[in-house]
């Protein structure tokens, strides 16, 4: 999805549930097939039936089925036709227990889907802060970007996942980092009217003076979205 205005930059750029980086018609199928035939870590040499059952169980949120498939030899890094591992599927579907199972089984925490969505991005989007913390501890790449040049911080900020945003800041993410279209995390939060997240970012040193590639500040973006409380927060010199 291209982002050509503030509305498209922010509000229209993160539909829910997690739908990120769709390719043009035709390309998607080709990319998905290439991802399937290039599965890493020797997946094709293993029991494809067990792999298929693992992914189906993950999609259904079936903890028992996941455990059985793993016991039967399924690869922890098996991926479906769009390149999603059971871990990514679990995180997208808000199945933290299942996600923990896959993490404990040794799934590659940086193995993303065809669209580039990594486990950390999926967890950040869902606001699964404990899992974000665990992923970071296991070496998840915090600066990884997907096909739309978005990352864990932009997803967390846009979704108003304040606890996750604070955790990412503590992990070393610059509150004034510039992302695609010269957007900052503050702009993403402002564009969705996430006042609490805006406040947390301001308190962490995020600048309200930065401008995107249209010359708009976070305040301008909040005004365009008619987010009254967010506008008040950005206008206020005191930010309790």
Describe the function of each predicted region.
Residues 29-40:
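Bacterial N-terminal signal peptides
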Residues 62-70, 95-103, 128-136, 161-169, ...:
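Ankyrin repeat structural motif
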Residues 56-61, 89-95, 122-128, 155-161, ...:
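Ankyrin repeat A-helix N-terminal signature
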Residues 46-85, 89:
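N-terminal segments that cap or nucleate solenoid repeat domains
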Residues 2-6, 44-53, 171, 203-207, ...:
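Ankyrin-repeat-protein effector appendages
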């Amino acid at each position: 999805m291209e982002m050509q205005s503030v509305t498209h930059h922010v509000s229209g750029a993160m539909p829910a549930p997690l739908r990120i980086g769709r390719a043009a018609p035709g390309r998607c199928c080709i990319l998905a097939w290439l991802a399937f035939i290039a599965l890493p870590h020797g997946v094709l040499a293993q029991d494809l039936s067990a792999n298929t059952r693992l992914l189906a169980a993950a999609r259904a949120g079936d903890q028992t089925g996941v455990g059985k498939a793993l016991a039967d030899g399924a690869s922890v890094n098996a991926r479906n036709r769009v390149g999603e591992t059971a871990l990514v599927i679990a995180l997208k579907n808000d199945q933290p227990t299942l996600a923990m199972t896959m993490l404990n089984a040794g799934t590659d925490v940086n193995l993303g889907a065809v669209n580039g969505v990594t486990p950390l991005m999926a967890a950040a989007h869902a606001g699964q802060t404990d899992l974000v913390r665990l992923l970071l501890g296991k070496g998840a790449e915090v600066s990884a970007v997907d096909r739309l040049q978005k990352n864990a911080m932009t997803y967390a900020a846009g979704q108003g996942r304040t606890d996750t945003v604070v955790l990412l800041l503590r992990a070393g993410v610059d509150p004034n980092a510039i992302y695609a279209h010269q957007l900052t995390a503050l702009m993403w939060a402002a564009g969705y009217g996430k006042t609490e997240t805006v406040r947390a970012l301001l308190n962490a040193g995020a600048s309200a003076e930065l401008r995107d590639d249209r010359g708009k500040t976070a305040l301008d973006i909040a005004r365009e979205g008619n987010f009254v409380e967010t506008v008040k927060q950005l206008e206020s010199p005191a930010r309790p």
